[in-house]
Amino acid sequence: PFDLYALIGALIENDKESIEAVASLIGKNYARPQRLLSGAIIAAGNFRQPQFVPLLIKTLKHPHPPIRAHSAWALGKIGGKEAMEALAYALKGETDERVIREIEGALGTIN
């Protein structure tokens, strides 16, 4: 079975073996590390499982703004106190407008 949690962890670490394994399934053009990580983050948000929150908190600090934006969106979908606290903290230091909008939107969806 497919282990999204392990894949996200491997992508955070930029594990070449995992990237190559995915590339063999979907094609090298679609297997760029940042693209794979963004897709995995979106999938994690759609699963809405709290187990992904610690990984998404890590990706919320990624240097690539679209990955931070997707992470904020996913944390908003999952919700919970830990996600809300991480989003509020990230908002304080975020400078990218798109990421700020995603964080604010995510915070608005968490009860």
Language-model features, listed with the residues they occupy:
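Non-heme iron-sulfur electron-transfer modules
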Residues: P1-E13
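Amphipathic alpha-helical scaffolding segments comprising HEAT/armadillo-like alpha-solenoid repeats
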Residues: Y5, D15-A23, R48-K61, G80-K92
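A structural signal for alpha-helix termini and helix-coil/disorder junctions
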Residues: A10-E13, G93, T109
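C-terminal structural cap/anchor segments
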Residues: K16-N46
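Polar/charged alpha-helical tracts
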Residues: E20, P54, E97-R101, G105
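Short inter-helical turns and helix N-cap capping residues of alpha-solenoid HEAT/ARM repeat scaffolds
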Residues: P33, P63-P65, T95-D96
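Structural detector for internal amphipathic alpha-helices that build alpha-solenoid repeat scaffolds
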Residues: Q34-Q49, K58, R68-G80, Y89, ...
